[in-house]
């Protein structure tokens, strides 16, 4: 554990180019629209008649001419385009700050999703938030890299709009190895070897709902469909697990969970492991569904994670509410 943010200030400066320096991948995969549209056990595949145009603008078809499956694909593509837009805007803000001679964009400027800014109105004015911003900015100036890269710090919120949330999977802090963290709990970019916890999630997924185990660990499809993949701490130092714990992230992510509980109804909260289950006190169990199991790590997966059937249970709950189920296939 590290000291207060005031003691961790700036050693040698590093540029954003260094912060965002590409990492070495196991293989280079450039997802196309075909690979990003949901596929599945439920099966929602990409369709040339539905999707985004060359300009990235979403193309609408006449609702009366679309099947249920086509409407599902159209909705997925719309939110995928929105997620990509939010990431692009974050990158632009970082580049603009650099062009103005500023080493980094302000932390609050990287939360792009309007629905979350509205839902969390006032939260970014709290004293803890100002202290958190100072801490993260001092870490960005430091010699030890932090993960994920700045434009992906709020990827969970920027990928899953507040009004889109159907389920919440709570993680701890980001993966601390180079290239692993992408701002979505448990997820790694395509081309990066899935960690053991994610492999165990895929094994349970296969046994529970019959989905095939994917060749990658990118959970973006889940996020775009309404599964909020939220870590309780959103940044970490390279090779130093929990190094940004108790620096201000927990009050913020607690506020996210509490806001969902207070302002929405019928959300499925998936809590794996003791750390995630501690967050159940923030959730109104009379309004929402809470699923608990052991953490999927190699040390605890055999103590209650395997066989929990949380994926099928989530979809059963969503169907009872009249909502479309999650296509868990990656």
Short names for language-model regions:
Residues 1-147, 329-330:
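N-terminal intrinsically disordered, compositionally biased regulatory/targeting segments
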Residues 86, 90-101, 109-268, 275-278, ...:
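A polyanion-binding, active-site-adjacent surface
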Residues 318-319:
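Short loop/turn segments that flank or connect secondary-structure elements
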């Amino acid at each position: 554990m590290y000291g207060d943010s005031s003691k961790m200030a700036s050693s040698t400066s590093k540029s954003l180019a260094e912060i965002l320096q590409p990492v070495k991948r196991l293989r280079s995969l450039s997802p196309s629209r075909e690979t990003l549209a949901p596929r599945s056990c439920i099966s929602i595949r990409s369709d040339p008649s539905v999707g985004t145009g060359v300009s990235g603008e979403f193309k609408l078809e006449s609702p009366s001419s679309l099947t249920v499956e086509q409407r599902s694909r159209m909705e997925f593509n719309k939110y995928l385009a929105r997620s990509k837009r939010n990431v692009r805007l974050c990158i632009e803000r970082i580049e603009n700050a650099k062009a103005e001679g500023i080493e980094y964009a302000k932390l609050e400027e990287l939360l792009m999703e309007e629905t979350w800014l509205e839902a969390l109105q006032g939260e970014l004015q709290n004293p803890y938030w100002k202290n958190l911003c100072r801490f993260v900015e001092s870490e960005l100036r430091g010699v030890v890299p932090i993960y994920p890269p700045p434009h992906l710090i709020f990827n969970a919120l920027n990928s899953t709009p507040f009004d889109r949330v159907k389920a919440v999977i709570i993680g701890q802090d980001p993966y601390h190895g180079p290239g692993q963290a992408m701002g979505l709990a448990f997820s790694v970019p395509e081309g990066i070897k899935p960690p053991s916890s994610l492999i165990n999630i895929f094994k349970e997924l296969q046994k529970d709902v019959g989905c095939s185990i994917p060749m990658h660990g990118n959970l973006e499809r889940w996020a775009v469909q309404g599964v909020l993949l939220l870590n309780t701490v959103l940044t970490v130092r390279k090779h130093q697990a929990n190094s940004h714990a108790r620096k201000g992230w927990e009050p913020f992510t607690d506020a996210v969970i509490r806001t969902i509980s207070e302002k929405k109804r019928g959300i499925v909260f998936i809590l794996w492991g003791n750390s995630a289950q501690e967050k159940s006190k923030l959730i109104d169990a009379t309004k929402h569904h809470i699923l608990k199991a052991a953490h999927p790590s190699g040390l605890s997966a055999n103590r209650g994670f395997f066989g929990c059937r949380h994926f099928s249970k989530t979809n059963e709950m969503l169907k009872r509410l009249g909502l479309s189920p999650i296509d868990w296939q990656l």
